[in-house]
């Protein structure tokens, strides 16, 4: 189950955001492991000021970003299929940064929002991008999940490798 909490008025411009996030997180959960499909995720829709505060407080980076993930449980060695906790964690998405990226990349708002929700969800279950191999694995999985939703590969125009 995904709970969406809107804490910034700017999200009112996109009334379908909650449904987009629900669908994206459900697709990600189902594609990874059946046990995860029943776990809880909270998604906070905030603005650049809100996510900047979170980024500064939790990561020591004093600037806004598009999405942050806060896993509820991070077992040593990473999450394993079948070991999903009841509450996976929280995701925060910043409206202005997300909107700007979508516009700059000529992507529909809903597609980019879906991508960030999937990206954030995968972080909750241990997928990372600290090195090139991890990033490639996560990007491949993101692309597969988004394709299931009818969304084109978000990385296709970047380097032509997907």
Model regions and ranges:
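An acidic/histidine-cluster motif and surrounding catalytic segment
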Residues: 1-113, 124-162
């Amino acid at each position: 189950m995904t709970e969406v909490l809107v804490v910034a008025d700017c999200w009112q411009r996109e009334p379908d955001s909650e449904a987009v996030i629900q669908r994206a997180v459900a697709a990600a959960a189902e594609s990874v492991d059946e046990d995860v499909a029943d776990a809880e995720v909270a998604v906070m829709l905030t603005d650049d000021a809100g996510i900047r505060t979170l980024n500064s407080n939790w990561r020591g980076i004093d600037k806004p970003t598009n999405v942050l993930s806060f896993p509820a449980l991070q077992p040593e060695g990473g999450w394993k299929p079948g070991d999903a906790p009841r509450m996976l964690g929280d995701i925060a998405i910043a409206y202005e940064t997300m909107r700007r990226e979508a516009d700059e990349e000529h992507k529909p708002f809903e597609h980019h929002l879906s991508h960030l929700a999937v990206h954030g969800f995968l972080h909750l279950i241990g997928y990372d991008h600290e090195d090139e191999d991890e990033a490639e694995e996560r990007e491949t999985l993101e692309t597969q999940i988004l394709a299931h939703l009818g969304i084109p590969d978000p990385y296709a125009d970047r380097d032509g490798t997907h």
